[in-house]
């Protein structure tokens, strides 16, 4: 058996900040090549790499305390190393922010998932990470066919949700809502798919906007510590990710996700800002048309559509940052291989 790249495992070595991590590589007996570029960044290259090969980024840990995705990725990497997991796609596995993970917090100085646009940002530990990740994405996707590029950025939600798992499709200038991507969501038994209506500054948006990748931010359950995640609830997702890496069609039946459009983004404009509900309210809690659910300065925050629902409410964001998304359920269809709605 080939010597492992890791002292313990991809995840354990990434989080062990007492040990240095050196760039190194190995080739397995099946011809699959593993290249550890830096702490938390592993490239896996199939034996038969070609122009037809998918190029897939599977990222986790953009928020340090969202650990379920790290555990899922770690198990896949382990099974690749042992030869149990077939590899036909070129993959980049990322555990992004081990310092925050070890501190059991989302971030140290700045929300990393707000730093992937081209705006000027204040210096921070997270800005250094964002800049490194941008370079890694560029290097990974350079000289690859556009249609081969995928990016699944895996997260967990802070609060409970009426949908235990959901995915967000970023809004870009490119055709990044393919039927293949939606089929992946449905086979993963992800309960809801949100279609963003404006550009953002997230990691998945960056890959979709600048590299035309089929990209999603995927929210998997709630934040928990390593070893305390309900990974059995993500069996369908795990199988579907593994099938994607092996480039085979899933054998299990899909479950169509409920599709939502983002109707608007609530941005905090004033110091005097609050919601009328407590922090226990679930994502996708809906309101009647005209129902007031908060205020921003002297302006009431109210539902502008019947059954308009709130996602990611956060009363504590800084002025100028997103305080919530408002979403409405839609009937979607495919047009020229792209998911659209009327």
From Swiss-Prot:
Biological process according to GO: arginine catabolic process to glutamate; arginine catabolic process to succinate
Record field: catalytic activity: N-succinyl-L-glutamate + H2O = L-glutamate + succinate
Cofactors demanded by this protein: Zn(2+)
Molecular-function annotations in GO: hydrolase activity, acting on ester bonds; succinylglutamate desuccinylase activity; zinc ion binding
UniProt-listed SUPFAM superfamilies: Zn-dependent exopeptidases
Enzyme active site: 219
HAMAP family xrefs: Arg_catab_AstE (MF_00767)
Protein name, UniProt field: Succinylglutamate desuccinylase
